[in-house]
């Protein structure tokens, strides 16, 4: 029993970021959970995010739900129980930001309590998270991050950029700016022998 507690303790402290349900679903649909883990480290979710992404998704027959479940089983994503502190903070968020779902409030409160950056796409949720001091990360920057960190090739980064742009209906100007940044990094690496 003590060994299991020690393993759980190590796992909890190895999380590098948390992720909300909608961002996780987008990444699962794009088959890009591995890229997110490469960029941000092991991802933490709450039980309510698991409920929304895995159990509800499997009930509806969504393939992305199975991808998320496999990422949980493999340890890329860790499901965390929420304690009373998180429940109270989530309730406060829900009262002040009525547009947020319970799942959003839980993951924001979890991130705040654990001092983890939060991968989060929804604008309202980002504003609520940032208002309580949570660092937020947009998945729009994922293609740049994985290329800068050299965890993905230029070609894979371009594919991820294209997929994210389509999934999030990014304006072409934003997509072109990100593509230009990838091109410039590639050029600089070539100039520096890398």
Regions found by a protein language model. Name each.
Residues 123-124, 141:
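Short, ordered loop/turn segments at secondary-structure junctions
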Residues 168-170:
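Long, amphipathic alpha-helical surface segments
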Residues 87, 126, 144:
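Positions that flank functional sites
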Residues 55, 130, 148-149:
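Short Asp/Glu-rich motifs
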Residues 139-153:
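Long, charge-dense
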Residues 2-110, 114-116, 123, 134, ...:
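Active-site-proximal, substrate-binding regions of enzyme catalytic domains
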Residues 127, 131-137:
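A short alpha->loop->secondary-structure connector
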Residues 163-166:
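Helix-rich interaction surfaces within compact, conserved domain-sized segments
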